[in-house]
Amino acid sequence: VGDGRRIGKGNFEVNRATAETNFISALAQCEAAVEIFRAQNKGHLVVISSMSALRGLPKHLSTYAASKAAVAHLAEGIRAELLDTPIKVSTIFPGYIRTEMNEGAKKLPFEVDEKTGCKALVKAIEKAPVKAYVPQWPWLPMGIAMKILPLKLVNKLS
């Protein structure tokens, strides 16, 4: 959930709720799923992060991006622990997908509709990758760019 606010503006409770929803909820779900997967010695844990997780982002996105980065690192830690098991762990980094949750927001660059986004998510998940950027075009090259571009330029793109 991306309902964060700017840091240092008296919005701690809203930012905490964003962090709890995005990270603590994912942690609880991972705990439950991995327990089941360990018991059956198989499974595929799919963790949904965000393209926003790739860099620190300004303003209302700071807490959202940080919580999604935490989710991605949680998945990587779980994957590291399960490397020599039949349990797979995938981290999915969706770009902008228009859904009910954000239907009132302004249209964003490279945004796809819900149907296109869902098809891309399913296609990525079925391949059981370690990481996937969804939809792959343009988010795979955008992800690479986000990691190497100067922060000032990333801020303008966000």
What are these regions (language model features)?
Residues 1-16, 60:
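Conserved mid-core segment of classical short-chain dehydrogenase/reductases
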Residues 30, 67:
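Active-site helix of classical SDR
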Residues 35, 80-84:
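Alpha-helical segment proximal to the catalytic Tyr-Lys
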Residues 50:
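Residue(s) in the substrate-gating loop at a strand-loop-helix junction
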Residues 57-63, 77:
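Active-site loop-to-helix junction immediately N-terminal to the catalytic Tyr of the SDR YXXXK motif
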Residues 91, 106-143:
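C-terminal helical subdomain
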Residues 94-104:
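Short, flexible catalytic-loop segment of classical short-chain dehydrogenase/reductase
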